[in-house]
Amino acid sequence: MNRWLLPEDITDVMPAEACKVESLRRAVLDLYQSYGYELVAPPILEFLDSLLTGTGSDLNLQTFKLVDQLSGRTLGLRADMTPQVARIDAHLLNRADVTRLCYAGSVAHARTPVGSSAREELQLGAEIYGCATWEADLEAITLLLKTLSVAGLEKVYLDLSHAGILAGILDGQSLDKETIEALYGLLQSKDRPRLGEWSTCLPENVAKALVALIELNGPCAEVLAKAKKELPKHAAIDKALADLERLVSAAANLSANVELSIDLADLRGYQYHSGVMFAAYVDRLPQPIARGGRYDHVGQAFGRPRPATGFSLDLLTLANLSPLNVRKMAITAPWVEDAELSKAIAALRDKGEVVIQVLAGTTLEAAEYQCDRELVKQGSSWEVKKK
C-alpha cells in the first residue's frame, strides 16, 4: 500500500486553495463580528453521548467513534458543530438574554454525504439563541446572504419550508421512528405514486395532505395561497404558514439578486428543526450550499431549553465556487547580509506587504504569489521597483 494514499473522499487542501479558504474565513468571521456574533471553538472530540445529545439518528451514523484510552468511554469525532455550540450556550455561557455565536472548524463524516464527494468539511456557521420571534430568523437569513455575497456569489436561490406543517399533518398519528424516516424519504424524492401507496394506511385527510406537499413548491405567493386551500385546518399548520408569509414579506427586500421560493416537501432535518427552515442554492451546485432554520428544542437536551435559529455551510465548497481572486501580490528580495536590506524588508512586512527572499542558488516557485515588484539597491538604500 502506498504511504501517500488518503482514505476515500478525504483530500489535502493545496496552497492556492488554502489561501482562498483562509481569506474567506477571515472575511466572513469579521462580517459576523460586525453583527455582534462571538466566536467559539468547541473541541473536535467529545464523549459520544454528549456529542449526540438532542440530535437525530443521521448524526449518529455519520460520527466516527473511538475509545478514550484514559476513561474507557466512547468518544465521537464531530460530524456537526451545531449541537456543540448549543451545548456551550445552554451549559457553559448560561446567559438569560440573546446570545449570538459563530464558529468555524473541521468536521468529519463516517459516510460520504449524499450529493457530496468529501467526508471532511470546514464547517462555518452562526446561531442566535434566546429569541423566538421571526426577526431572529430574518437576521440568520440576512447573514447567510451576506456570507455568500462576501464570497462573490451574488445570484442566490433561497428555498423556504417549515417543520410545523408536517408536525400538524401528522398530529394524532402514532408513527414510529422508522416510518417517519420512510415518509421523509418519499417527500424528499417527491415520489408521488409511492407516497400515495404508502399513505393508504393513514386517514384519508392525512394521506391527501401528504401527497399535496409534493406539489406545494414554487413562487412564494402561489404556494402559500395553494397551501391555505389544500392543507387541513390545524393550529400548527396555520402558524407555520403565517410564519412563512411574514418572513417572505420581510425577506423580499433583502437583495435584488435573491430569488425566493417555497418547497414544503423539503424537510431535510425535520426531526431536528422546529420551525422555519431554509436552504440556499447557487449556480453550478445541485445541492444546497447552505442550510439553516429554527431548532428550539436542542438546548432542552442540555437541561436548558432556549429558542435558537441559525445556519451552516462548508467553507471548502464556498471557496471552490467563489469567483474571487485572492492571489496575493508580493515583493522579491535577494538573500544577502545587509543591515539596510533587513530594515527595508521588516518595514514592508509591518505595512502588510508580502516580501519573499530568494535563497541563494534557488528560483522562486511560489505559485500562489504574484511577484510584481522587487527590492533593488539604489546607492546605499533599498527601494521597491516594478519588475
Curated annotation (Swiss-Prot):
Superkingdom to which the source organism belongs: Bacteria
Compartments, as annotated in UniProt: Cytoplasm
Keywords: Amino-acid biosynthesis, Cytoplasm, Histidine biosynthesis
GO cellular component: cytoplasm
Coiled-coil segments: none
Recorded metabolic or biological pathway in which this protein acts: Amino-acid biosynthesis; L-histidine biosynthesis; L-histidine from 5-phospho-alpha-D-ribose 1-diphosphate: step 1/9
Record has Chaperone as a keyword: no
Keyword Amino-acid biosynthesis applies: yes
GO biological process, one term: L-histidine biosynthetic process
Homology family: Belongs to the class-II aminoacyl-tRNA synthetase family. HisZ subfamily.
Biological role stated in the UniProt entry: Required for the first step of histidine biosynthesis. May allow the feedback regulation of ATP phosphoribosyltransferase activity by histidine.
UniProt miscellaneous comment: This function is generally fulfilled by the C-terminal part of HisG, which is missing in some bacteria such as this one.
Subunit structure: Heteromultimer composed of HisG and HisZ subunits.
Protein name: ATP phosphoribosyltransferase regulatory subunit
Organism encoding this protein: Polynucleobacter necessarius subsp. necessarius (strain STIR1)
